[in-house]
Amino acid sequence: MPGSNFEVITAMVEIAPGFKAGKHTHPGTVQVQMLDGEFWLAIDGQPEKTYRAGEAFEVPTGATHNEGALGDKPAKFVAVYIVEKGKPLVQPAQ
């Protein structure tokens, strides 16, 4: 993104069954496309949601949230982060 203070980071993510990330934020938006398994997402102030293969969702900039894998197999997804340059990709919630 020439001339901007943002960068795009694309990651293939695999989360172990039963893993819970703990409340955290990102310095930009996160677009997620589920590939396999089940994944839960709890954004503060919203009901917890479950996502499965073929579904997509977004985590808004700065939204405090928790997440993890459900079931007995890993949750696999592609995450596209559009975040401020030079800031940590993940920040524990205060």
Question: How should each PLM-predicted stretch be described?
Answer:
Residues 1-9, 50, 58, 88-94:
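A short, N-terminal "cap"/entry segment at the start of jelly-roll beta-barrel domains
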Residues 1-23:
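A short glycine-rich, His/Asp/Glu-containing loop-to-beta-strand
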Residues 3-5, 25, 33, 70-74:
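Extracellular/periplasmic catalytic domains that process cell-envelope and extracellular macromolecules
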Residues 5, 15-17, 45-62:
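Short acidic-glycine-tyrosine-enriched beta hairpin
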Residues 14, 40, 78-81:
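Soluble periplasmic/extracytoplasmic beta-strand elements of cell-envelope proteins
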Residues 20-29, 63:
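Histidine-centered catalytic micro-motifs
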Residues 26-45, 53-55, 85:
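Glycine- and acidic-residue-biased ligand/ion/polar-headgroup-sensing regions
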Residues 62-87:
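Ligand-binding loop in jelly-roll beta-barrel domains
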